[in-house]
């Protein structure tokens, strides 16, 4: 079920009226659904643009069409038009399922570690152009990672590993007892902080 506030409906209706195209609606879709990069996309949809498999939600003065493949990702979404503390108004979409759901506690440790790495750790490392990949998760709970991008060869990789990644994984995935680095940092060609300048 998707909730669309009255304010959001009024906002959409005004935009559609300005376009002046009979039968125009709004199409909602999930982009890169199930990944950390997931986002919602809204766009005008003329009747000729529709594929026929969209879910139609009748609103006050227009129809919101949800792309069929996006329906599971948009379940529980809320669309609103809010006034920010600065006085500016903004359309907001909260779609709690769009990035996927964390694996159940009954899932394997490997699945849970990969989910935390992809959905929590890598988005933070991306701000420095870095990333990590899970190379191995041993039966006794030792996670072996390989750094890439700006983290490959970075002088702060050890700090990131121990104070960031290891703490996060041990706190979020029961059974993880240690995190190790399998990266040959001497081969990094574009580190965020070169190893010889880290103190």
Curated annotation (Swiss-Prot):
Its cofactor is [4Fe-4S] cluster. SUPFAM superfamilies: Fe-S cluster assembly (FSCA) domain-like, HesB-like domain. GO terms for molecular function: 4 iron, 4 sulfur cluster binding; iron ion binding. The keyword Nucleus does not apply. One of its GO terms (biological process) is iron-sulfur cluster assembly. [4Fe-4S] cluster binds at residues 151, 154. Pfam families: NifU. Gene3D superfamilies: Fe-S cluster assembly (FSCA), HesB-like domain. Keywords: 4Fe-4S, Iron, Iron-sulfur, Metal-binding. Binds 1 [4Fe-4S] cluster per subunit. The cluster is presumably bound at the interface of two monomers. InterPro entries: Fe/S_biogenesis_protein_NfuA, FSCA_dom_sf, HesB-like_dom_sf, NIF_FeS_clus_asmbl_NifU_C. It comes from the Bacteria. Involved in iron-sulfur cluster biogenesis. Binds a 4Fe-4S cluster, can transfer this cluster to apoproteins, and thereby intervenes in the maturation of Fe/S proteins. Could also act as a scaffold/chaperone for damaged Fe/S proteins. Belongs to the NfuA family. Homodimer. This is Fe/S biogenesis protein NfuA.
């Amino acid at each position: 079920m998707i909730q669309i506030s009255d304010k959001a409906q009024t906002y959409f209706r005004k935009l559609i009226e300005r376009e002046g195209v009979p039968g125009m609606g709004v199409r909602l879709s999930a982009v890169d659904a199930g990944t950390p990069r997931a986002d919602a996309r809204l766009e005008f949809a003329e009747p000729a643009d529709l594929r026929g498999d969209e879910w139609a939600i009748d609103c006050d003065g227009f129809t919101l069409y949800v792309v069929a493949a996006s329906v599971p990702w948009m379940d529980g979404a809320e669309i609103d038009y809010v006034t920010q503390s600065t006085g500016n108004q903004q359309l907001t979409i909260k779609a709690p399922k769009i990035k996927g759901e964390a694996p159940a506690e009954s899932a394997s440790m490997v699945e849970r570690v990969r989910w935390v790495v992809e959905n929590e750790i890598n988005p933070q490392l991306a701000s420095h152009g870095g990333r990590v990949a899970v190379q191995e998760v041993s039966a006794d709970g030792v996670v072996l990672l390989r750094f890439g991008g700006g983290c490959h060869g970075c002088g702060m990789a050890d700090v990131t590993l121990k104070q960031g990644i290891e703490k996060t994984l041990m706190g979020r995935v029961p059974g993880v007892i240690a995190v190790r680095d399998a990266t040959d940092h001497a081969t990094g060609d574009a580190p965020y902080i070169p190893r010889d300048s880290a103190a």
